[in-house]
Amino acid sequence: QTYFKHHAIDLHYKVHRAMEVDKDISKVETILGELKQLGAARNEPILIVGGGVLADIAGFAAALYHRNTPYVMLNTSIVSGIDAGPSPRTCSDGYGYKNLFGAYHAPILSITDRSFFKTLHPGWIRHGIAEIIKMGGVKDLALIELLEAAGPDLVRTAFGTVATEPGSEIDGLSKQILGLALKSYVE
C-alpha cells in the first residue's frame, strides 16, 4: 500500500483466503463480481498477490473478465513462484472435480520475491521442495544435487530468508535452486 501511495497510484484491493478447498468456481465468480464492482477496465492490469491457489483462481477470473484482462502475478510461495505463478494454465475446481474449469491465460509478468517465504509455515516450504524434487527427478538432476547440498537448511532458513546473511552459502544455493527450478518449468 505504501508503494502505491508513494507513486500516487489508486489502489483497490480485496483479500481472499486461498487454500486448496477454496479453489472452486464460486470463488472465481466472487472475484469476477468484485472486479465488476470496482469498475476494472478490460485493459487495466490486475495485480494478484498470493500463492498457487490464488494464481489459479484469480488468473482464471482474469481470463474470463472481459475476455482476457491482463494480470501481474506476485508470487508469495515457492510453488507459485516456480509453477502456478508463471503458468499460462489457470483453473478452478467444480462439481467435485479438480481443475474442471480452466483457460490458458499467462500473466504479463510473474515476480517471485523470496522475502515472502519467511512468512511460510515449514510445511509449505517442504511442499515447495517436494515440487522441486519432482522437477529434478523428471528433468534436471542438478536440482537434486543442489537440494542435497542445501539440506535441511532450506527449511530452517525458509530458502535463505530467515537467520542468514545475504551472500551466505544458503542464500546462494536458494537462489540457484529457485532459478534452476523456474528455468526447468519454463523449458
Predicted regions and their residues:
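Loop/helix-junction capping segments adjacent to catalytic residues or to phosphate/diphosphate-binding pockets
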Residues: V21-I25, A55-D56, T119
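Short, structurally constrained coil/turn elements
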Residues: K5-H7, A40, Y65, G94, ...
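ATP/NTP phosphate-donor binding region
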Residues: Q1-P45, K134
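Active-site segments that bind and position negatively charged phosphate/pyrophosphate groups
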Residues: R156-E187
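Active-site and donor-binding regions of nucleotide-sugar-utilizing enzymes
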Residues: A40-V72
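Generic structural signal for well-ordered, non-membrane alpha-helical segments
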Residues: D24, V28, P122-I129, D140, ...
